[in-house]
Structures are given as C-alpha cells and as structure tokens.
Amino acid sequence: MARNRQACDCCCIRRVKCDRKKPCKCCLQHNLQCTYLRPLKKRGPKPVKVRNLKKVDDVQVFSKSSSGGIMKVPKALIDQCLRLYNDKLYVIWPLLCYDDLYELLEKRYDETCVYWFLVSLSAATLSDLQTEIESEGGVTFTGIQLSSFCMSSRQEFDDFNGSDIFKIMTYYCLNRCYAQMSNSRTSYRLSCEAVGLIKLAGFHREETLKLLPFDEQQLGRKVYYLLLLTERYFSVYTHCATSLDTTIAPPQPENVTDPRLSLDSFLEMIRVFTVPGKCFFDALATDSANVTCTEDSLKKIWRELHTVPLEIEPWSYGYVDISFSRHWIRTLAWKLVLQISGMRISFLSNSKNTHIPVEIARDMLEDTFLIPKNLYAVHGPGISVKALEIADALVDVVNQYDQNAESEAWNFLFDISKFVFSLKHCDSTLVDKFTTKCQCALITLPLSNPLESTDGSKEDVDALP
C-alpha cells in the first residue's frame, strides 16, 4: 500500500504520530474518519536565485572553504577600490596608477604577493576615505574588514623568506589602515616591517635601483620616500631615531595629462620633509641637541618652507598635506631652538621669537578659510596632530613672554583651537596633554562639548599622516 506524503487530518490536529496509511492505525483505534484533505505543505529549500548566490559568494570571502583554504576577495570588489584610489589618493601617496593596478588584477591575481597587495591597497583606500563599498550581492565591505582579513592571513604574504616590492607595499598599506583605526602602535610596527624589508631588498642604495627597468626604479623610489616621510613623522611622537635618509634620488616627474596622476604634490612633500635633514628629526626624537643640527640648517628650514610653490594646485588634496606639513615643521624648528641650550640664532632674536608661532598660526588659518573640510580626513590623523602642535606653541608664547605677545597669541589660539577640535582625533593622549597645558596657563578653550577620542584609547603615540 502506498504511503501518503504527510499525516492525516485527524493526526495532524491531535498532534500524534501517523503511519500515513489510509486509514491510519490511530484513526482505526479511536473510530475516527481518516481523511487526507489538507493541501500539502511546501517543504525543503527555496528556489535558488542569482542574487542569493552572489550574496553567498561575498559572505564566503571571510570564511574557510571546505578544502581548508581561504576564499579570495572578488575581483569586482577590488576593482572598485582601485578606481577610488586612482581618483582620490594616488596624488597623495602614489604607488601605481589604475591602468597598472588593473593589469595586475587581471594577469597576476593568483600570485600570492600580488593578491595580498591588492587587498591591502583596497583596505587602505576605504580606511583613508572613511567609506565602504557594497558588492553586487548587497554585502557591505569596510577597510577594517579587509585589513583584518590581511592581518589574519599574514603568513600567506610574508613567509619571512626574502623581500620584494609587493610585500613592502602591503605593509605600507596596512600601516595606513591601522593609523585610521586609532591603532597607532600597530601602525608604527607595520611601518617598521616595511622599512626593514626595503633595506633587505637594497632599495636604499642607488646601485640596486640602477639595475632595474625604469618603471621598477620609479616604483621603488616612490615606496622608499613614502616610508621616509612616514618614519620622520613617527620619530617626533614615538621618540625613535630614523633609519632612512636621502641615499637615493626621488622619483622623476612624469608627463601626464591627468592631474590626478601628477607627482608634483608628492615631490613637494618629499622636499618639505627632506629640507630639515635626518639630524633635525633625530634631535626631536631624542629631545637633545644634534651636532649636525646647526644654526644654518634651522635658517634653511625657515627660509625654504615659508611658501608653497606656485605649480601646486591651491586647495587640492596634495596642497592640504603640503601646507600643514610646512607649518608643522617650522613650528618644530622654533621649539628645537628653545630646546637646544646655548643656541642663539640671529633671525630668532628675543623680540621676534615670540612672533614666529603667531606668524605660523596666521598662515595656517589663512589656509583653513579656503580649504574644503572634506579634504582633511583623507590625510589621516596627521593633519589634526600638526595643527595641535601649532596651537601648543602659541600656549608656550602665552606662558613665557610679555603681555602684548600674549594677547596676540591668545587671539590666534582661540581660532586655532576651534579648528583643531573640529577635526577627527584618533587618539586622545595628545589632546589631553594640550588641554592640561592650557589649563595650567589659565586659558579657557572655545569648546562647546568635551572632546572625546574616537575609540577611547590611551596610546602614547598618534597615527600616520
């Protein structure tokens, strides 16, 4: 006798086990009429839709496959990030243009080092732009997700066996990610990994680079100077001496018609960070005088970093970083003169000494009036740190000099502090030190609400520019 596909009507209502015969055993025992009139219930999986399949694929990016390997980030998702990087970030930290990156994506996607570089570049792009992207299946990806994916798979791209340009760039990109995520200690450690690898590869020596084709030379020079800038920024706040110096030539200017691919801004940033020299940053890192940090070298900083070259497009992505870095380094030079005992510099006479931070503050405020606020975030926490350093110098003027200087400095401090506290701060440590210093000087800051760190962390160092 054929069995029915579901329980009879009586057994279903009574919620008892049915043998699905007609009549069933339970109905016979209780003298019930056994019927099968109810419509069959739909059971089993729902129909598979194309959209559901795509969503499953995207979710599995961060899951292990049945064979034990790790699923790859889809090409289409990486491609979206590469386009964003080319449009908005290449001018700030140039590695490869979109055409070159797309060629890597299409031809070398299956090569381990190349693949992880592309994923880390995607993570850094989303982190710097503070945005997220959505796949075709509706799954959202962020810089935090992609960078965590890279870090959990570190053994995939770094086997501690030699060095190549893709490993170096991967660590550089990850260092940018963690700078934006308020994790500056990890960011600094990752930058140190990149610096170590670039030395192992010999990219700090002209003899090594000259043996390479021009395109590879150019890429090596870009990466080297990106790390040099990063290391010199960190030296001020980690108090660690630098290891990279201008032992190789910067990348050569490139003839391009697209301003997004111009190296002008990057080459100017290199100039801004190399005019002071390695000795300048080492003196700041060690809080002590360096015999090579002389009066002439400090004069050079003041003279050569006074203005931005005319060829840099005003109030562009590149201009913002150059402008704030100039003001920041000139302020650090002023502080270094006060720090080095016995150094008396003619152009920093007592009468003019008090005016220097005020002049720097005035220049910075003039820039902020014309720069769209959305341009600050892409440079990371470095902009807010550099502005805070200038405000800190004004507090020193208020503390140490005559009443006229104090009044002028206070007026600028009022405006600068409003600007500083309008920016995103990834770490509250430097801000806490600044506000404490102001309270000691009996200065009331123009704050409508108390400033809070974005993550509540209490690290001793801030993050990358």
Curated annotation (Swiss-Prot):
PROSITE patterns: ZN2_CY6_FUNGAL_1, ZN2_CY6_FUNGAL_2
GO biological process, one term: cellular response to ethanol
Induction (UniProt): Expression is increased about 5-fold by ethanol.
Alphabetical UniProt keywords: DNA-binding, Metal-binding, Nucleus, Transcription, Transcription regulation, Zinc
Job description of the protein: Transcription factor that regulates respiratory growth and plays a critical role in stress adaptation during non-fermentative growth. Binds to promoters of genes involved in non-fermentative metabolism, including processes such as gluconeogenesis (PCK1, FBP1 and MDH2), glyoxylate shunt (MLS1 and ICL1) and the tricarboxylic acid cycle (ACO1). Plays a role in maintaining mitochondrial morphology and function. Also plays a role in tolerance to pH and osmotic stress, especially during the oxidative metabolism.
Family of this protein: Belongs to the MAL13 family.
Name listed for the protein in its UniProt record: Respiratory transcription factor ZNF1
The encoding gene: ZNF1
